[in-house]
Every structure is written in C-alpha cells, then in structure tokens.
Amino acid sequence: MLPTLTALLCLGLCLSQRINTEKQTLPKPIIWAKPSIMVTKGNSVNIWCQGAQSASEYQLYFEGSFFALERPKSSRSMNKVKFFISQMTSHTAGIYTCFYQSGELWSESSNPLKLVVTGLYDTPTLWVHPGPEVTLGENVTFSCHLKTATSKFFLLKERESNHIQHKYGNIQAEFPMGPVTRAHRGTYRCFGSYNDYAWSFPSEPVTLLITGEVENTSLAPTDPVSSLDYWEFDLSTKESGLQKDSAFWDHTAQNLIRIGLACIIVMALVWLLAEDWLSRRKDHEKLNRLTSWECRGRRRMHRYHEEEQRDAISMRELKATPGDM
C-alpha cells in the first residue's frame, strides 16, 4: 500500500511540474519596420523584433512559414534584433510575425506586421469634388484614377491608421465622404493595387480644407517626395515599450490544471483506501466465519462425546441390573 501511494504522489508532482512548464508563456514581442512599413520596390528595409531582456534567440515568420533566425549581438541589445531585407519585392511583401526564446520557453507570436511594397505600377491621379476647400457638413468624393488596369484602390490619410479605405475598381474608384467634419481635414494620397501588399506609386497629395477654420500651414500641399518615409501609417504594431505584462503567466489555466490533477490524485487515494478497507473487511469476515465454524465443530464434538458418555453409562447400568436381580 505505501509504495503505491508514494508512486502516485511522485507521478502527480512530475505531471504538475511538466504541465506548469508547458503552460508558461513569455509575453508577446513587438515588431516594426524601419524606415517604413511601405517600401518602394528595390529599396531595403529592417524588421525589428523586441522581446524580453533575457531573450537568447529570435525567429521571423513570413506568411506563417519560418523566414529567418537572429541572435542578439551583445548583452546590451538582448531585448531586440534586426532582420534585414536588402531588396523589397512583391515576393517579400506580406505579413510578418516574430517569436523569441528565453531559457526553454518560447514567447507568444507578435502582432502581425503588414509590409507593403510600392512602385509596382504607374502613378495614380487623385482629386476631390467639390474641393479641395469645402464647408462643414458638405459631402465630398475622392476619385483615384490609374491608367494601368488594377483591381483595388487604397485611400490613405496622412498619419491616421484608422483612416485607410479601399475600394474595388478597374481603372478608377470613388471614395465618398460626408457630411464632412473637422476630423476629415488633412492630406490624402491614393494607390492602385492587385493585392493588399503590392501597391503602385503614391499619387500627388491632395489636402482637404474646411472653411471657417484658422489656417494651418501644416496642412498645406507639399512637394512630391520620392520616398514614403513621411507616410508612417500604422498598419500594424508601432515601435513602443514592451508590454506592461512582461511577467504574464496563464495563472487561471495552471490553477485549473493543478486542481484537476489534485482531484485525480485524491480520487485515486480514496479508491485505494476503499479497496484496502474492503479487502480487510472481507478477510475479517472470512476469519469470523472460520472461527464460527471451528466453534460449531467443537460444540458438536463436545455434544457427541457427551452423548457417547451417556450411552456408555446407560449400557453399564443395563448390564448391572440383571445380576442384581
């Protein structure tokens, strides 16, 4: 009995330790691209992945498949690494994620980084009607035209990730807005595309002005630029500090597993104790039955001897009676 209980306890402790190790996950890393997530065809880009200070290895995945591996170069840069893409093409545009390892544990996957290549098609033309100066409450429509046939158009507002719109079209797409508010003012560009990550050159900027407001020179049209460094659209996670839950552990799952494991061990112990008690009870009942049978046998033998003695006495008395007569 004691060896069995000891073996069960050891098994429970080993399983608990193994499950505890497997369920521990490191906090997800952050991922970003420099100089931008929108890269002109042929240009280079760096993809950064930042994890915990104790990270020993980083892995980059592209469209769900392993892409590259990097290890921190020095102790001062243990918490981040750089993955270099020398030439951006339509084959390197898409969704990237990264992981890092610390000890025997691997982190969760980072948020997806959507890397876009531009400059694959002609430059589209963007205009707004009416405009570019409109009054509050008025309806406007942005039109994006591309000579080369495409399937999708994107309209982007400068520095606003939540203001990315897309429309399907062949050579032109319309983006209606309104009634306009002060939130609509700003500078817009459009792109043509055959998919979400391979875009044309950007259009010339078009600035939407709202009348009745104080003039803001920062919203005035700018000269065309050859790179998109100025257009840092947050299509994915920006560079920032590591998440506050850097010591995040799935306590709820661990506790539930421990409780379940403890219940199984307790049930096993109860079952063993019940089996032992039933076995002892059966042995005791068997012993009682044997003892009872022995007592009955002794009583029967005792009665038999008594009867033999009485019979012998009776026989002697019968033999003695005729002689006396």
Swiss-Prot record:
Sequence intervals crossing the membrane: 259-279
Gene Ontology CC, one term: plasma membrane
Signal peptide: 1-16
Membrane topology annotation: Single-pass type I membrane protein
InterPro entries: Ig-like_dom_sf, Ig-like_fold, Ig-like_Receptors_ImmuneReg, Ig_sub, Immunoglobulin_dom
Keyword flag Oxidoreductase: no
Compartment list: Cell membrane
Annotated GO biological process: defense response to virus; detection of virus; immune response-regulating signaling pathway
Disulphide-bridged cysteine pairs: 49-98, 144-190
Tissue spec. comment: Weakly expressed in spleen, heart and lung.
Membrane-side (Cytoplasmic) residue stretches: 280-325
Pfam families registered for this protein in UniProt: ig (PF00047), Ig_2 (PF13895)
Gene3D superfamilies (alphabetical): Immunoglobulins
Keywords: Cell membrane, Disulfide bond, Glycoprotein, Immunoglobulin domain, Membrane, Receptor, Repeat, Signal, Transmembrane, Transmembrane helix
Residues annotated as domain Ig-like: 42-100, 137-192
PANTHER family: MHC CLASS I NK CELL RECEPTOR, NATURAL CYTOTOXICITY TRIGGERING RECEPTOR 1
Function of the protein: Cytotoxicity-activating receptor that may contribute to the increased efficiency of activated natural killer (NK) cells to mediate tumor cell lysis.
Name of the protein in question: Natural cytotoxicity triggering receptor 1
